[in-house]
Every structure is written in structure tokens, then in C-alpha cells.
């Protein structure tokens, strides 16, 4: 018998709690998070596989793998998110890595992974911190071309993870953290300032003053987007709805048919984070599944097309 599996697609934003939004929208967001939290805790996963991105806090251009499994991981605590060690399951992580290698995925493995809000915020929303069920963290590069995984590869990875889980008698929750449409001011190697290019290439721990400055710049960018600044790429609720529609009906082929460049053009440079959802959902059977939670709002102050999507399957 194959153990039950569940999927949670969850956007994240470091600006939650930093940039104010309308009280009614705050209540809506908190109510939606409470609903998904209630569903996940009632479902009671025995293992969590979390696919998330990084924002130049743990992975840098000096060595940027498309995907990396962590046997141990520490959250750096950026933007006020929880800091400290994740409750990783190294045996499950290594077994998954071996399975992926056997299925021709040349997967990277980190024995000491650093992660940021791209991982920690999702765990905090559901479990109130980093004290979670046993966890396998999988980093996905979503910012540094040309190594951003393509849609077909994301689907294939998720399907391979699903085959691994077929032989694992544990109720497993797969979380995709990221997206949806958004383009925050994340620097690239095309930046004209060599100091900026160096900062996203070479691993180092920023000072608190540098972190504070980065936070203020991001808060200002959120306010600018909310004010309609033409220099900021707008969110794309229509694109976000199509993405969520495809995953809700269990149709990954509708997403792998998309043009890679169109993701950036239509939804923003950082919308590639949405591929974490595709990886996670592809580990579950195709086709419609019970989906007790779906919620979405475009929230410019957070620079986020913010979505929540929870689906589950029963044992077969």
C-alpha cells in the first residue's frame, strides 16, 4: 500500500509584517493561512519534503546547482524569520539522493545547507517555527541563469520523488515554497556595480547593517509597486490563476508546455520560484485531487502574487 501524500503550494514574502496592508486584507491572509495550517496539522504528515529557493543567503554564483538536497540545514533568520537548525531527516535525504542518481538525476547534496525565508517562512506559518516533522529540504535555483531548472525537468524531478515515496511507508507532505508572479529587486550578474556582482558570487555573511539596508530597500520597492511606479513590474493575477488552475486539476503538462522566457516576461524574474510548486505537485498522482484550500490575492505591498493551494490523496 502506498502511503498517503499531500501537496502544499505556498507563496512567501519577506515583507509580510514589514509593509502594512489594509486590515481587511491582513485578516483574509491570516484566515487563509489558518485554514491551511488546520488542514496540514489534521492530516498529520510523518515526513515533509520542502522544495524552496534561495535569495543569495545560502547559495551563490561561485557554485550554483539547479537542485540540491540537504542532509542538514540551518535557517539564517533573514527578515525576522526563524533562525536555527531544521529538523532534517538525513537518512531519508540520502536515500532520496541515491534514488535520484539511479534515475539519472545528477543531484547535488549538501551536508551543511543554509536556507533563508524561502524555507523558513512556510515552516513558520504551519508549525509556528522550525520544530516540524522530519524534513528533507530541496533547494531549487530560481534566480541565476542559465542554471534555473526548466519546466520539464521540474516535473520529471517531482515524478521521480513520487516513485521514491511509493516505497516509503510514511505520510508525506510535499511543499513548494515560492512565487507566484513577482519581480523584486534581486540583483543579477548583469548589474553594473562590481561590488554587487561580487556579493552574489562569493559566499559571506552580511553584517547586520547590510541586512537592515537590504530590508529598507525591499520595503521601499513594495511601496513603489503598490503606488504604481512604472519602474516596478506589476503582478499578474491572470498568470497566477492559470498556474494554480493547472496544479489544482493535476495537469502538469499544461505548465511544461509554457515557454520559459514567457515566465519572466509575463510574471517576472522571480516567478521561476513557482516551479517549486510544479516539483511538489508532480510527486502526487496526476488528475484532480481533493483540494480543501485554495486562496489567492495579488498584494503589491508584499511584491507577491500570494497563493495557497492544498491538495491531498488517500492511501491506495
PLM regions: where:
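Beta-strand elements within well-structured catalytic alpha/beta cores of enzymes
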Residues: 46-52, 138, 170-180
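Flexible, D/E/H-enriched segments
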Residues: 1-45, 61-156, 167, 187-316
Amino acid at each position: 500500500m502506498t502511503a498517503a501524500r499531500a501537496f502544499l503550494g505556498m507563496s512567501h514574502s519577506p515583507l509580510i509584517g514589514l509593509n502594512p496592508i489594509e486590515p481587511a486584507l491582513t485578516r483574509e491572509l491570516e484566515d487563509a493561512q489558518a485554514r491551511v495550517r488546520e488542514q496540514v496539522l489534521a492530516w498529520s504528515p510523518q515526513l515533509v519534503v520542502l522544495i524552496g529557493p534561495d535569495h543569495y543567503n545560502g547559495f551563490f554564483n561561485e557554485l550554483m546547482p539547479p537542485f540540491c538536497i540537504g542532509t542538514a540545514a540551518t535557517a539564517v533568520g533573514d527578515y525576522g524569520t526563524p533562525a536555527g537548525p531544521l529538523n532534517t531527516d538525513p537518512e531519508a535525504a540520502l536515500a532520496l539522493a541515491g534514488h535520484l542518481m539511479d534515475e539519472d538525476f545528477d543531484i547535488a547534496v549538501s551536508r551543511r545547507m543554509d536556507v533563508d525565508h524561502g524555507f523558513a517562512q512556510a515552516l513558520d506559518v504551519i508549525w509556528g517555527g522550525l520544530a516540524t516533522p522530519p524534513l528533507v529540504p530541496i533547494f531549487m535555483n530560481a534566480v541565476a541563469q542559465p542554471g534555473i531548472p526548466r519546466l520539464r525537468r521540474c516535473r520529471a524531478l517531482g515524478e521521480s520523488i513520487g516513485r521514491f515515496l511509493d516505497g516509503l511507508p510514511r505520510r508525506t507532505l510535499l511543499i513548494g515554497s515560492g512565487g507566484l508572479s513577482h519581480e523584486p529587486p534581486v540583483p543579477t550578474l548583469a548589474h553594473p556595480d562590481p561590488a554587487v556582482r561580487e556579493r552574489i558570487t562569493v559566499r559571506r555573511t552580511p553584517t547586520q547593517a547590510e541586512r537592515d539596508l537590504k530590508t529598507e530597500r525591499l520595503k521601499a520597492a513594495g511601496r513603489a509597486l503598490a503606488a504604481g511606479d512604472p519602474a516596478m513590474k506589476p503582478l499578474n493575477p491572470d498568470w497566477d490563476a492559470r498556474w494554480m488552475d493547472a496544479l489544482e486539476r493535476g495537469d502538469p503538462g499544461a505548465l511544461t508546455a509554457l515557454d520559459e522566457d514567457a515566465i519572466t516576461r509575463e510574471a517576472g524574474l522571480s516567478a521561476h520560484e513557482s516551479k517549486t510548486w510544479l516539483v511538489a505537485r508532480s510527486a502526487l498522482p496526476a488528475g484532480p485531487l481533493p483540494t480543501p484550500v485554495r486562496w489567492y490575492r495579488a498584494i503589491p505591498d508584499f511584491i507577491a502574487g500570494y497563493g495557497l493551494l492544498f491538495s491531498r490523496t488517500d492511501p491506495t
